[in-house]
């Protein structure tokens, strides 16, 4: 995730520079290249978390029950890592365009109004426990990404004029 955060900062700078130059094409290219790079940067973690979760868990724990639960959670986290990294970079790209308030609203909707209730329902009502919490968080991440990427595309499709 830290690589994706670094990529978000770099993407924000590149997008901001393109916006300042009134270059629509470079604004979009900078944002979408950042998304692709973030996805590729998170793939190694995803690979190990999905295919070797028990090995990773054994590095930190001895108790077999904790290892098994951690392995289950690592698979979910591994699958979410790509989307989480892409979400972070999309936020950076939007920051570079100067759009900060609407992404905040979108994040609030995705996590507080969608992700949290799903997490609660799965973890408490259906008794999925920590797995349900991660499914809820994952739904927030995924919904957020589905809201933010079209927002960036819409904003970056025309010159951005700041007063």
Residues of each region from the PLM?
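Alpha-helical transmembrane segments of multi-pass membrane proteins
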Residues: 4, 64-87, 109
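Small-residue-rich hydrophobic transmembrane alpha-helices
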Residues: 1-53, 84-103
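Hydrophobic alpha-helical segments of multi-pass membrane transport proteins
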Residues: 76-90, 140-155
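Membrane-interface helix-loop junctions in multi-pass transport and translocation proteins
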Residues: 53, 59, 67-68, 111-145, ...
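Transmembrane helix-loop junction
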Residues: 5, 17, 58-59, 72, ...
């Amino acid at each position: 995730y830290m690589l994706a955060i670094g990529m978000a900062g770099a993407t924000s700078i590149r997008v901001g520079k393109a916006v300042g130059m009134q270059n629509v094409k470079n604004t979009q290219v900078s944002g979408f290249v950042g998304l692709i790079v973030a996805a590729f940067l998170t793939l190694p973690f995803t690979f190990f978390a999905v295919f070797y979760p028990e090995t990773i868990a054994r590095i930190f724990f001895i108790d077999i029950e904790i290892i098994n639960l951690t392995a289950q959670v690592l698979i979910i986290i591994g699958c979410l890592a790509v989307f989480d990294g892409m979400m972070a970079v999309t936020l950076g790209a939007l920051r570079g365009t100067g759009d900060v308030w609407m992404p905040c609203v979108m994040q609030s909707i995705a996590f507080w109004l969608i992700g949290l209730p799903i997490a609660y329902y799965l973890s408490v009502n259906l008794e999925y426990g920590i797995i349900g919490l991660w499914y809820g968080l994952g739904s927030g991440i995924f919904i957020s990404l589905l809201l933010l990427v079209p927002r960036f595309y819409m904003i970056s499709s025309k010159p951005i004029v700041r007063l």
